[in-house]
Curated annotation (Swiss-Prot):
Protein name stated in the entry: Vacuolar membrane-associated protein iml1
Domain of life: Eukaryota
Gene3D superfamilies: Winged helix-like DNA-binding domain superfamily/Winged helix DNA-binding domain (1.10.10.10)
Boundaries of every DEP domain copy: 1338-1413
Low complexity biased stretches: 797-814
Keyword Hydrolase listed: no
Residue spans of biased composition, Basic residues class: 1-12, 728-738
Region ranges (Disordered): 1-49, 728-817, 887-976, 1422-1475, 1822-1842
Protein localization: Vacuole membrane
Gene source species: Neosartorya fischeri (strain ATCC 1020 / DSM 3700 / CBS 544.65 / FGSC A1164 / JCM 1740 / NRRL 181 / WB 181)
A GO cellular component annotation in the UniProt record: GATOR1 complex
Membrane found in the keyword field: yes
Basic and acidic residues bias (residue ranges): 36-49, 750-767
CDD domains: DEP_DEPDC5-like
C-alpha cells in the first residue's frame, strides 16, 4: 500500500534509509542507537518501551570462541553448541545465543561505502535468493542485521565424546547465509528474546494452494516461539513447503530473529493469478514530449512489462497472467445524430454537462497464460494495440430487438456501422468497473479451485497520474466487494507523480433532497478544471463538472434523478485497498546500466549536481502564450510548509479589509483577446462568467500603493498570522459572524523555500505559541491550477440555511464572481506591477470578500479557514496552490464597506503553521452557528480536519467533506459512514504526517507492511509476489459505534457428543480452533491491538497471542474476527460451549437497498481472445453481501448435520471436479503390466478404475465408533465399490431399463453378495463342487443375470468382483480378496464355471463368468436386468456407513433418502412422485486424505464417484470439503493420477459447470461458436434395445453427424444434456441435479471442451484448469501411491513391480504442436510445455473449424458416415471403421495372450466384413492381430484429422 500524501523525500533518502545504521558514528553512540533516533517514526507498532530497547549487545557479556562448520554426515543438527565450554556465561538450555563475527576496527567504515554504493542494485537481486550473490552479507553489515541467533539445545553425548574441544559448530547452509567460515573467531553472548523479536516475517511459497487457516496452523506449528533465519526452509505436515524471505526488526531487514507471539507473518505467493488491466485512455496515444518522444503505450510494452516479467523470471515465480485492455469511449451527439439511433441498452448516458453517451470496452489479450512465456504475451499485446483504437471507434447500431444467444447480444451480420467516439481521459475512465469485473469471479472462488495457485492480484496500468473521477455508487460497490474478498490492487501510473496525495478518487456523495430537482443547481457547480488533462491538447472546449462521470455505469436512474441525487461538492478519498506506484523508465534505464557495469553509468544514489534547469510542470495554455514562464524575472520567497505539521487557523485581528488597506492594482488582459474567452478555459467557474455584465468589471486596477506601504501591510499581516494561540482563542470568542477573508498561497512541502524574514518570525512564534486550541481543525480548500482541482464548486450556505446541509444554490442576485486568476509577481522591491498581463502568483480576492447580507454586522476581518487540496496536474513539477480563505468568525466588528462586487487584488500573504501536530484536533461535539457563512460568498468552506486523531474513538470518518456544515454533520451522513471503512477522506494537498503514519491508514492490509512504503517508487515486492491478506488486523470500531451502528446476532455452539458423529471435534478447544480456521479461510482476520481492547474493555486483547490456542480455550477467553462490515465475537463460556455474536453494520444492509437493483446492471462491450468483434454483455456488479449462514456452518463443524440437505452448496464447500479420460496404452505400459497382457485396452481401463476403488475403500474415513464395530468383524478386507459398467450412455440405460431399475437401490450401495448365517458359513476343505454350485445359484448365492456387453448378450452370468466378495463373506477360512481369487481359480480349474469367452482366468473385476453346463441349475426365468432385484432378506456387509451421515453400523446397510425398502420382485415406487422415478447416478463417500496422520485434526473430504460408467466415456470424480487442508487433497489426487496413468487413464481437472455457462462466473471468458458450412442430413434412426431384444424405435438423432465429427477429432463424452434423459425420470447425482443444457465432450488431451447446441453449432471452451505444473509432483505422487496400493497387485504375475517405474507426466498429457493429431507423441512420452498447453486448444480448434468450413470434406464425411450401419453408441466410437466390417475369428488362447501391443501409429488396417452382430470379446481378440481399434476402447487409436 502506498504511503499517501506528500511524502516527497529525496530519492537518496528513500533508498538509503534502511542503511542508516551502517553509517560511521562515534564510538560512544552505537549504530543501533542512531537507528532508533532516525527511524523511530517508522516503528508503527512499537510501544515507547520497545523503542528504547538497545538493540546492540555491547553491554552483554561476550565470549570469543572458534566456530566450526560441519556437514550432515557429522550431524543433522543445524547448530551444535557445547554448553560446558561456556560455563562462565551461565548458559541454560532454552536461552537465545547471539553469534557475531569478530570484526576489525575498519569494518564499519567499509560497510558504509559498500552498503550505500550497492544497496539499491542488490535489493531486488537478493530477494531471488542469497545463493546468487557473491557476498550475501552485503546488506547485513551491522551487528543487528548480520547476527546469528539460535536456541541452546543439549549437545549429543557421542559428539561431545568424540570432539571434546568443539565449542560451536554450524552446518554449511547456515554458514553460507551468515558468511561464516570454518575456524573463524566469533563472539558469543546471551541475548534477551525481547531484543531480537521480529516484527514482521516474509514467508514465500509456490506451486500450492494454501488457505489462510493453513498459514495460521503452519505458524503455530513451525514458527511460533522459535528462532528463524533468512532462507530457512519450512515444511509443514511433510507436504506444505515455504521459505523465509525477509525478517524485520523495527523496520530493518535482519538475517535472523525470534518469532515472538507478536510477530506478524506475511505470506507471499510466488504462484498467483495476475490480472493486468491496461487503461487505453486518450493519453496512451500522446507523445512523451519531454522524454524519448515515444507514445505512452511504449512505456508499457517496452519498459514496465518487460521489467516485470524479468523480475518474475529472476525470482522463479510461476504466475498465471490475464491481460485486458480497457477504455471508455465518449460519443458526441453530432456523430450519433439526433435522436440517437441507438437502443437504450447500447450506450449509457452519463449525467455530464453535455450529456455525453459512453460505452466501456474490454479486450482480453491473454487469459491464464503462464508468466514464463512473456515473449508470447508481449507479441499478443503488440498485435492488439495496433487495432484497438480502430475496433473501439467502430460503432455498430443495435436495434432493441437484437437477438441474444447464451446471454450475449448477437447482432445481424449486415448491421450498419459508423466511426464515432474517442477514448476518454484517464481521469474519467472506467477503472472501478474494470477492477470490480476482475474481482467478480472471486465470489465463486470456492468452485473449480485451482490447486497449484494461491492469491489473485490485480495490476492496473494507467497513463494518468493516479486521480480518478468516479461515482459514489461505483466506489462504494467496488470497495465493499474488495473488502469482502481480500484482494490486492496495484496501480501503476505512467505519468509523473503529482504534488498531492495519491491515489485519489473524487466523487460526489448522494444527498437527500426535498422537493423537485432544479437544473439550475447543475450550473452552480461551475467548471472543473481538473477534468482537463494537460496533455490533451486536442480538446480545448470547456467542460462542466460532471455530477458523476461514472454513475452511468449503473443504468436505471434517469438523468433528472441523477441530478437530484448528487451534491454539488466534490469529496476526495483515498482507498485502503489500492497500492500505487509510478513507473519512471529513466530510473530503471540507469539501473540496468549500473547492473551491466557500464563505466559511464552514474554512481548509484549519490548526490550529483542537477545538470538541467528546472522545468515547470504547469501547463496552462494561456500562461504559455503570455510568455510569462520564459521572461518573468520577478522573484518570490515562499516559506516552508513543515512536514508533518497541519496548517493552523489564523485570525486577522486588526487587519483592515477596507479598500484603502488593500492593493488595488489592476492588470489588463491581452488586448487582442476576449475577456470571456480568456477566463472560460479552466480559469473561472461558469457562474462567474454568467455574472459578468460589464467587461470593465473584470479588469484589475493598477496599484496605487508604494512598495513601502505594501511591505508595511505585509508586516502587519504577518503579525496577525504568527501571533500566539492564546490571543487567537480570545479573538475567536469575540468573533460571531463569519466573513470571507484574504487568500493564501501555499505550496506542497516537497518544494519548499523559506525567506529569512519568515524563518525569524516562524521561530519566534513557534517558541511563544501554546499547545492548546483543540477546537478548530486545519481547514484548507482546493487550490486552482491549470489542469488541477477545480475552483470552489458552490456557494457558501446562507445565514438562513441549515448548517447540516449545504445550500446548493445561492441567490443569483447576490452572486459575485468567485476568483480572478490574474496573478502578479510584483512584490517587495520591484515597484509597481508591470503594465503587461500578469499570470503568476497574485490572486484576485474578489470572491473571498463576499457581500454581507442586510442586517448583519460587517466585520473587517474574518478568521482564516483554509484547506488546501492538491492539484490534479498530470505532471510532476510544482504548481502554486491558490487557497481561498473563508472567514469562520469575524475578529472585529468594524464594518466593511461594500462599494462593488468586484474587489481589488491583494498582495500575496504567506503563512507557516506552527508545530502543532495533533493539538488542534476538533472535538466531536462542536457546533456551527447558523450565521456561519455569508450568503453571497461563492467560495466553498471546506470543513473537517486535514488529518485524523488516532486516539479518537469514533472510528474512521471523513476528515474532508465539502458540505457547508461541520464535519460532524458530514460524518453522520449514512453514505459517508458506509464508505468510511474503506475509503478515507483527506485533504490531499497537505496531509499530515501523523495521519500518514496512522496504522489504520492501510485498512485490512496494515500488517502487511513492515515499514511504511513510499509512493514514488515501484512496489516490486507486491508486483512480484503478492501478499496474502494478513491473519491479523487492528481495524475495529469504537464501543459506541459497535453498539449503535451494528446489528447483533448471538447464538451458541457446542460439540456434538453423538458417538456416531463423523470427524466431530471432541472438545471445546478443538471446536474453537476449527471455527477460527473456517473464518480465516473465508477472509476473516483476527482483531488485535488497542482499538479492540478499548472497545471491548478487555486489555488482554491488545497483546493477544493468536498463535497459542491454549490461551484461547480458557473460560471467558474472547476472540474477535472481522471481515468488511461483519465482526464475529467468539467467547468460551461455561459448560463447554462457545458463544458467537455476529455484528453486522447497519449501513451496509440498508444503504441504497432500494436502489441496488437499479445500479447493478453493467453493460460493457467485451471481446474475448478468439472473438472477432465486441459484443455487449449484461453483468451484475453487486457486491457479494455476507449471506453465509454462519450458524449452520458452526453447527456443521460441531457435528450437528441432520438439518442440512445439501451442505456442499448451502455452506459453500470448496469443490473440484476431475475426469478420467481413457487413453491408448503405450508399449511401455504394456511391458510394465505383463500380468494383464491378455486384456484389451478397455479391460485395462476398467482395471484402473477398479484399482482406484480399492484405494478409495482402503482410505475411506471411518469414525472411531464404526471402527470398533468393524474390528468385531473377522474379515480383514473391505468390499470394492459397486460400480456398474455399461457400454451405453447413462441416458440410454435409464430409458431402456426404467421398468426394472432404481439406481438409488440400497443394495447398490454395497456388494450384492448374500450373507449366510454364521452356522452355515462354508469352509474350503469341506465343500463339494455340486453343493457349492447349488448354493451359488440359490437364493443366497451370487447374483446371476443376463448381461450385455456392446453387441453380445451373455446369459445367466455373474461378475468376478461380486463372486470374490461372496466368497470372502461366506467362507470362514477366506480372509482376503487375494485368497478368494486364488480359491476361485481352483474352482475354475475343476470346471465349476468358465469365462464367457473362455479367455480369462478368474479375476476380481468386471469379468463375466457362467456356471458350467454340468453344474447349471434350471431357472424358471432369467433375471435379465443390469440392476439387482430387491430382496427383503438381504443382509449386506458394511462398506462405509459414513457414505450417508445418518447411517449407523447397526443397520448393516445404507438407507436411501428417496426410496423405501420394497418386498422382493416388486417394482420400485418413487417416494417423491407417483409419476416420477428417482435415479441416483453417483454416490458419495467420506475419504481420509491423511492416512499417515500428519495433521493434528481429521482431514476428510466428500468423494463423489460415478455408479454407472461406460468405458468409452469419462469417469467422473468430484471432491468437496469444508475445512480440510488443500495440500493434502492435492497429494491424494497426485497419487490417484499416478495410479490411473499406469492403466491408460488420464486424470484431468475440468470445470464443474458446463462450458456455455463460463461467462456467469468469469466475465472475461466466452465459448467460441463454430457452425457447419453445410448442414448435415437427417441422422439414421438409432437402435434401441433392452437386455433381451433389439428394436429400431424413436426418432432420428439430429446430432448424429455432430457426434461422429467429435469422435473423428478425438473427443469423448463428458456429460449428457438434461434433456437426453426421459422426462418421467428424475435423474440426480450425489453432488446435485445435472443442469447441463447441452451435451459436453472433452478432448483426450483434456485441454478443450465442446458442446453441441440445439441449433447444431459447436461451442468450444479451453480448459484452463489443466496445468503441467502438476507434472513435477508426479514422481512424489508415485512414491506416495506405492506405499498405499493394495496387496493383490504387488507382483502377481511377475517379480517386476509395474508401479515402481517413474510415472510420466501427469495430466494433462498434451501432444506437441507438430503432432497435434495424435494424443501422444510417437515416442510415447509427453513432450509439451505450458506454452504449448496454452496453445493446444487453439490448434485443435483451428483444425476442427477448417473442417467445418470445408464443404467438400463435410459432404464426403456425411456420405461415409451415413453408409455405415447404425450403432447404438452415442459416445465416442473407437474407430472410423464400421462395426459390421469386423469378421468373426476364433483364435487359440496362446495367440490371444500376446505380450506386445502394436504401435499406436500402425492401427489403421481395415478389414471388410458384413456381419451385423458379433461377439465383442471376439472382435477384441481380432483387434490384437489386425491392429484395429477395439469397440470398447473408446477411440483408443489416433484418428486422422483429415
Amino acid at each position: 500500500m502506498a504511503l499517501r500524501g506528500p511524502m516527497k523525500r529525496s530519492h537518496l533518502r528513500q533508498v538509503s534509509a534502511p542503511s542508516v545504521d551502517s553509517l560511521s558514528v562515534p564510538q560512544s553512540q552505537s549504530p543501533e542507537a542512531l537507528y532508533n533516533d532516525e527511524h523511530s517514526h517508522q516503528d508503527v507498532h512499537a510501544t515507547p518501551d520497545e523503542r528504547t530497547i538497545r538493540l546492540s549487545s555491547a553491554s552483554l557479556e561476550r565470549r570469543q570462541c572458534s566456530l566450526w562448520v560441519h556437514d550432515e554426515t557429522f550431524s543433522r543438527e543445524e547448530i551444535l553448541f557445547n554448553q560446558a565450554a561456556f560455563s562462565d556465561l551461565r548458559v541454560n538450555v532454552g536461552d537465545v545465543i547471539e553469534i557475531l563475527p569478530v570484526r576489525s576496527p575498519g569494518d564499519s567504515i567499509h560497510s558504509l561505502k559498500s552498503d550505500l554504493g550497492a544497496r539499491s542494485l542488490r535489493d531486488s537481486y537478493l530477494e531471488s535468493g542469497s545463493a546468487h550473490l557473491p557476498d550475501p552479507m552485503s546488506k547485513f553489515k551491522t551487528p543487528l542485521q548480520s547476527r546469528c541467533l539460535f536456541v541452546v539445545k543439549p549437545l549429543p553425548q557421542e559428539i561431545k565424546a568424540r570432539h571434546p574441544k568443539l565449542e560451536i559448530s554450524v552446518t554449511h547452509s547456515v554458514a553460507n547465509i551468515f558468511g561464516f567460515k570454518n575456524r573463524t573467531l566469533v563472539n558469543i553472548s546471551v541475548v534477551d528474546r525481547g531484543q531480537c523479536s521480529a516484527s514482521h516475517v516474509d514467508i514465500a511459497f509456490r506451486d500450492q494452494f494454501l488457505v489462510r487457516s493453513d498459514m495460521w496452523r503452519l505458524v503455530m506449528s513451525e514458527l511460533a516461539d522459535k528462532i528463524i533465519y533468512k532462507g530457512q526452509k519450512i515444511v509443514f505436515m511433510g507436504s506444505i513447503k515455504a521459505t523465509v524471505k525477509n525478517i524485520f526488526i523495527r523496520g530493518k531487514k535482519v538475517l535472523s530473529g525470534y518469532f515472538s507471539p507478536h510477530t506478524i507473518p506475511v505470506f507471499r505467493s510466488e504462484s498467483a493469478k495476475y490480472v493486468l488491466f491496461i487503461q487505453m485512455s486518450r493519453e496512451m496515444w500522446d507523445f512523451d514530449s519531454e522524454g524519448t518522444g515515444d507514445i505512452l503505450f511504449s512505456r508499457v510494452i517496452n519498459g514496465f512489462l518487460p521489467e516485470l516479467f524479468k523480475r518474475w523470471a529472476n525470482s522463479d515465480a510461476k504466475h498465471l497472467v490475464t491481460i485486458v485492455l480497457f477504455t471508455r469511449v465518449e460519443y458526441g451527439s453530432s456523430a450519433l445524430g439526433d435522436p440517437l439511433p441507438l437502443s437504450s441498452e447500447s450506450l449509457r448516458c452519463i449525467s455530464s454537462p453535455n450529456h455525453v453517451p459512453t460505452r466501456d470496452f474490454y479486450r482480453v489479450v491473454v487469459n491464464d497464460m503462464a508468466s514464463g512465456h512473456w515473449t508470447t504475451i508481449l507479441d499478443e499485446l503488440k498485435k492488439d494495440f495496433r487495432t484497438f483504437l480502430r475496433d473501439v471507434s467502430i460503432l455498430k447500431m443495435d436495434s432493441p430487438d437484437t437477438p441474444t444467444v447464451d446471454g450475449v447480444k448477437v447482432a445481424p451480420k449486415n448491421k450498419p456501422a459508423i466511426i464515432a467516439g474517442r477514448p476518454s481521459t484517464a481521469l474519467r475512465g472506467n477503472i472501478l468497473e474494470a477492477i470490480h469485473l476482475a474481482s467478480a469471479h472471486l465470489a465463486y472462488d470456492h468452485i473449480d479451485r485451482d490447486m497449484v495457485h494461491t492469491g489473485t492480484s490485480i495490476i492496473v496500468i494507467t497513463p494518468g497520474s493516479g486521480v480518478f473521477e468516479v461515482s459514489y455508487e461505483s466506489l462504494s460497490s467496488t470497495s465493499e466487494a474488495l473488502a469482502d474478498r481480500g484482494i490486492a490492487i496495484d496501480l501503476v501510473c505512467l505519468s509523473p507523480m503529482p504534488l498531492h496525495s495519491v491515489p485519489l478518487f473524487k466523487y460526489k456523495a448522494p444527498v437527500e433532497r426535498s422537493g423537485s430537482s432544479s437544473f439550475g443547481d447543475f450550473h452552480s457547480s461551475g467548471y472543473s478544471p481538473e477534468m482537463r488533462q494537460s496533455f490533451s491538447f486536442a480538446s480545448r472546449t470547456p467542460h462542466l463538472s460532471p455530477k458523476s462521470t461514472m454513475q452511468g455505469s449503473f443504468p436505471g436512474m434517469t438523468h433528472k434523478e441523477h441530478l437530484s441525487a448528487r451534491s454539488n461538492e466534490w469529496n476526495y478519498g483515498i482507498p485502503h485497498w489500492l497500492d500505487i506506484s509510478y513507473w519512471n523508465p529513466e530510473t530503471y534505464r540507469e539501473a540496468r546500466r549500473i547492473a551491466k557495469k557500464d563505466p559511464n553509468a552514474p554512481i548509484p544514489f549519490t548526490v550529483t549536481k542537477q545538470s538541467k534547469l528546472f522545468v515547470p510542470r504547469v501547463r496552462m495554455y494561456e500562461i504559455q502564450m503570455m510568455g510569462v514562464m520564459e521572461s518573468e524575472q520577478s522573484d518570490i520567497s515562499i516559506p516552508y510548509l513543515l512536514e508533518g505539521q497541519g496548517v493552523s487557523r489564523t485570525s486577522n485581528a486588526g487587519l483592515g479589509l477596507s479598500p484603502s488597506g488593500l492593493s488595488s492594482s489592476r492588470a489588463s488582459f491581452r488586448r487582442n483577446s476576449s475577456y470571456k474567452a480568456q477566463l472560460s478555459d479552466s480559469l473561472r467557474p461558469e457562474p462567474f462568467l454568467q455574472s459578468i455584465t460589464n467587461p470593465k468589471d473584470v479588469m484589475l486596477a493598477k496599484s496605487k500603493k508604494t512598495p513601502n506601504q505594501v511591505i508595511a501591510w505585509m508586516d502587519q499581516y504577518d503579525e496577525a498570522v504568527f501571533q500566539p494561540f492564546a490571543k487567537r482563542r480570545q479573538q475567536r470568542k469575540a468573533s460571531r459572524p463569519k466573513r470571507p477573508s484574504e487568500p493564501e498561497v501555499q505550496v506542497s512541502n516537497a518544494h519548499e523555500r523559506l525567506s529569512a524574514r519568515s524563518v525569524l518570525r516562524l521561530r519566534e512564534h513557534e517558541t511563544n505559541s501554546n499547545s492548546g486550541d483543540r477546537s478548530y481543525p486545519t481547514r484548507t480548500i482546493p487550490r486552482v491550477s491549470e489542469t488541477s482541482l477545480s475552483a470552489p464548486q458552490g456557494p457558501v450556505p446562507s445565514k438562513t440555511s441549515s448548517p447540516k446541509k449545504p445550500a446548493l444554490k445561492a441567490p443569483s442576485a447576490a452572486r459575485t464572481p468567485r476568483m480572478s486568476r490574474t496573478i502578479s509577481f510584483a512584490l517587495l522591491g520591484f515597484g509597481a506591477t508591470p503594465p503587461r498581463a500578469q499570470a503568476s502568483t497574485e490572486v484576485n480576492v474578489e470572491h473571498a470578500r463576499a457581500q454581507p447580507t442586510s442586517g448583519q454586522k460587517k466585520p473587517s476581518v474574518g478568521f482564516m479557514d483554509t484547506r488546501s487540496v492538491e492539484s490534479f496536474s498530470g505532471s510532476d513539477s510544482a504548481s502554486i496552490s491558490t487557497v481561498i480563505d473563508t472567514s469562520l468568525r469575524p475578529a472585529s466588528p468594524h464594518p466593511a464597506p461594500q462599494k462593488s462586487a468586484m474587489t481589488p487584488t491583494r498582495p500575496i500573504s504567506i503563512k507557516v503553521p506552527p508545530r502543532q501536530p495533533s493539538e488542534d484536533t476538533e472535538p466531536v461535539d462542536r457546533t456551527v452557528l447558523p450565521e456561519s457563512y455569508s450568503t453571497t460568498s461563492t467560495a466553498i468552506p471546506f470543513t473537517g480536519d486535514g488529518r485524523r486523531d488516532s486516539r479518537t474513538k469514533n472510528g474512521p470518518r471523513f476528515e474532508l467533506t465539502v458540505s457547508g456544515g461541520s464535519r460532524e454533520s458530514s460524518i453522520k451522513s449514512p453514505q459517508n459512514k458506509a464508505l468510511a471503512p474503506w475509503v478515507r477522506s483527506i485533504n490531499p494537498c497537505n496531509t499530515s504526517r501523523d495521519v500518514l503514519r496512522d496504522t489504520s491508514w492501510f485498512g485490512r492490509w496494515q500488517h502487511a507492511y513492515p515499514r511504511p512504503p513510499h509512493v514514488a517508487v515501484v512496489k516490486w515486492k507486491s508486483l512480484k509476489s503478492p501478499a496474502i491478506l494478513p491473519l491479523t488486523t487492528e481495524e475495529f470500531p469504537t464501543a459506541q459505534e459497535l453498539g449503535s451502528d451494528y446489528l447483533q446476532t448471538p447464538y451458541r455452539v457446542f460439540p456434538n457428543d453423538d458417538p456416531e458423529g463423523v470427524e466431530v471435534p471432541k472438545t471445546r478447544g478443538i471446536l474453537l480452533r476449527e471455527m477460527i480456521s473456517l473464518r480465516l479461510s473465508h477472509g476473516f482476520q483476527i482483531v488485535i491491538g488497542k482499538h479492540v481492547a478499548e472497545a471491548s474493555g478487555q486489555p488482554a486483547l491488545e497483546t493477544l497471542n493468536v498463535f497459542d490456542t491454549r490461551s484461547l480455550e480458557r473460560d471467558g477467553a474472547t476472540v474477535f474476527l472481522s471481515k468488511g462490515n461483519t465482526i464475529h465475537r467468539l467467547i468460551c463460556v461455561d459448560g463447554g460451549e462457545i458463544e458467537v455474536t455476529r455484528f453486522t453494520h447497519r449501513t451496509s444492509s440498508t444503504l441504497a437497498a432500494g436502489k441496488r437493483d437499479d445500479f447493478s446492471l453493467y453493460t460493457p462491450a467485451m471481446r474475448t481472445i478468439l472473438s472477432t468483434e465486441y459484443e455487449l454483455k449484461n453483468i451484475k456488479l453487486d457486491p457479494t453481501a455476507e449471506d453465509y449462514n454462519w450458524n449452520y456452518a458452526d453447527n456443521y463443524v460441531a457435528g450437528h448435520r441432520d438439518y442440512l440437505f445439501n451442505p456442499a452448496q448451502q455452506l459453500q464447500f470448496w469443490r473440484v471436479r476431475y475426469v478420467l479420460i481413457p487413453m491408448p496404452l503405450q508399449v511401455n505400459n504394456r511391458r510394465h503390466l505383463q500380468s494383464f497382457n491378455e486384456d484389451n485396452e478397455e479391460e485395462i481401463h476398467l482395471l484402473g478404475i477398479n484399482q482406484l476403488t480399492h484405494i478409495w475403500q482402503r482410505h475411506r474415513y471411518v469414525p472411531p465408533e464404526e471402527k470398533r464395530f468393524e474390528s468385531s468383524n473377522e474379515k480383514k478386507d473391505q468390499n470394492p465399490l459397486n460400480i456398474m459398467y455399461q457400454t451405453r450412455n447413462p441416458s440410454e440405460v435409464v430409458a431402456a431399463e426404467l421398468d426394472r431399475i432404481l439406481l438409488s437401490d440400497p443394495g447398490l450401495d454395497n456388494s450384492p453378495a448374500q450373507l449366510l448365517p454364521e452356522s452355515e458359513l462354508l469352509e474350503r476343505s469341506s465343500i463339494s463342487l455340486s453343493s457349492l454350485a447349488q448354493i451359488i445359484q440359490g437364493e443366497k448365492g451370487v447374483r446371476m443375470m443376463d448381461r450385455r456387453w456392446h453387441w453380445r448378450l451373455h446369459y445367466n452370468c455373474f461378475i468376478g468382483f461380486e463372486f470374490t466378495t461372496w466368497l470372502l463373506q461366506n467362507f470362514r477360512d477366506i480372509d482376503s480378496r487375494e485368497e478368494a481369487v486364488q480359491f476361485g481359480n481352483e474352482l475354475m480349474k475343476h470346471g465349476l464355471f468358465q469365462h464367457v469367452e473362455k479367455r480369462h482366468n478368474f479375476r476380481d473385476g468386471n469379468y463375466f463368468y457362467q456356471i458350467s453346463s454340468e453344474y447349471r441349475v434350471a431357472r424358471p426365468e432369467s433375471r435379465g436386468s443390469w440392476f439387482p432385484q430387491k430382496k427383503s432378506d438381504k443382509t449386506v456387509p458394511s462398506t462405509a456407513a459414513s457414505e450417508n451421515p445418518r447411517d449407523s453400523p447397526v443397520n448393516g446397510h445404507s438407507r436411501s433418502d428417496s426410496v423405501e425398502t420394497l418386498p422382493p420382485h416388486m417394482p420400485a415406487t418413487p417416494s417423491k412422485s407417483k409419476n416420477k422415478a428417482t435415479i441416483m447416478l453417483s454416490k458419495m463417500m467420506k475419504y481420509d486424505v491423511d492416512p499417515r496422520k500428519r495433521s493434528n485434526r481429521p482431514e476428510v473430504i466428500d468423494l463423489h464417484y460415478d455408479r454407472l460408467h461406460n468405458p468409452d466415456n469419462c469417469f467422473h470424480i468430484e471432491l468437496s470439503w469444508m475445512n480440510t487442508t488443500p495440500k493434502l487433497i492435492e497429494d491424494t489426487v497426485l497419487s490417484w493420477a499416478a495410479t490411473a496413468e499406469k492403466f491408460g487413464l488420464k486424470l484431468v481437472q475440468v470445470p464443474i459447470a458446463e462450458g456455455c455457462a463460463i461467462s456467469r462466473t468469469q466475465p472475461f471468458r466466452k465459448p467460441y461458436r463454430v457452425s457447419l458450412t453445410v448442414p448435415p442430413p437427417p441422422g439414421p434412426v438409432p437402435t434401441v434395445f433392452n437386455t433381451a431384444t433389439f428394436s429400431q424405435l424413436g426418432s432420428s438423432d439430429r446430432h448424429y453427424y455432430h457426434k461422429a465429427m467429435l469422435r473423428k477429432f478425438d473427443f469423448v463424452l463428458d456429460f449428457e444434456a438434461r434433456s437426453a434423459f426421459p422426462a418421467d425420470v428424475e435423474v440426480s447425482y450425489s453432488w446435485g441435479t445435472p443442469d447441463y443444457q447441452y451435451p459436453q465432450y472433452i478432448h483426450r488431451s483434456g485441454s478443450l471442451l465442446v458442446q453441441i447446441t440445439d441449433e447444431g453449432d459447436f461451442l468450444f471452451l479451453a480448459n484452463r484448469l489443466v496445468s503441467t505444473r502438476l507434472a513435477a509432483a508426479t514422481r512424489e505422487g508415485s512414491r506416495y501411491e506405492r506405499m498405499d496400493r493394495p496387496e493383490h497387485l504387488r507382483a502377481r504375475a511377475s517379480t517386476y513391480d509395474p508401479l515402481d517405474r517413474i510415472s510420466p507426466r501427469l495430466s494433462p498429457l498434451v501432444r506437441p504442436l507438430h503432432d497435434i493429431g495424435s494424443p501422444i507423441s510417437p515416442q510415447g512420452q509427453p513432450s509439451i510445455d505450458s506454452a504449448h498447453l496454452y496453445r493446444a486448444p487453439e490448434h485443435i480448434l483451428k483444425s476442427f473449424e477448417e473442417f467445418c468450413n470445408d464443404a467438400a470434406r463435410l459432404e464426403q464425411f456425411y456420405s461415409v458416415s451415413h453408409a455405415r450401419p447404425v450403432s447404438t453408441k452415442v459416445g465416442p466410437a473407437p474407430t472410423t471403421l464400421m462395426d459390421s466390417s469386423i469378421p468373426t475369428l476364433e483364435l487359440p488362447a496362446s495367440v490371444v495372450s500376446h505380450h506386445i501391443h502394436p504401435p499406436a501409429l500402425m492401427s489403421r488396417a481395415s478389414v471388410d466384413g458384413s456381419i451385423p452382430s458379433i461377439d465383442a470379446m471376439t472382435r477384441a481378440r481380432n483387434d490384437s492381430l489386425s491392429y484395429k481399434g477395439s469397440p470398447k476402447s473408446g477411440s483408443l487409436r489416433p484418428l486422422n484429422m483429415t
